[in-house]
Amino acid sequence: LLNAGHEVVIVDDYSNSCPESIKRVEEITGKKVVSYEADVKDKEAMQKIFAENHIDCVIHFAGLKAVGESTRLPAKYYRNNIDTTLTLIECMKEAGVTKIVFSSTVYGDQKPPYNETMHKGDCTNPYGWTKSMMEQILTDCAQADPELTVILLRYFNPIGAHESGKIGEDPQGIPNNLMPYVSQVAAGVREQLTIFGGDYPTPDGTCRRDYIHVVD
């Protein structure tokens, strides 16, 4: 976005990231990034951020995303992920912001290949259900408000880092995705990588995944 000439405002509570990543983005692009340390569920904080900046469009990435943790702590996931969306859409309405892009992933265990028109399918974990519910909230809001434009992006597994090597996926604690886990094993931070599952319909019985590089 910065390289395309857009001004960027970042809101992050740094629960699974660090401010250093923003500094490195500024180094790579040579441009200043406006950033706030805040919880998107905090409506007062979000109202202040919208008031202090001219926002044309919101890209909504805020949310917890660990599938395994969501099965152990479902209420935490429903509270966090849905509340962030409700707070965000309310603050957008108050500020007159009419465009939002939402990061989603809700196809469940449907048979591939996937396409944009297929039924979302039943989700297999609380994390997936929160994404499905957030999609429905945004869809209903768009239907109720003809001025609101909502784009739902259903990603498969994003992976990789910037070609400079200065920014990439470096989560706090135990990684939930494959590449940072592999990287930590290679760096000696963790002893081994365990591959789960041995009865998938593949030549060796292990699971297959498709990935998209973050720069692409």
Predicted segments, located by residue:
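NAD(P)-dependent short-chain dehydrogenase/reductase
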Residues: 139-216
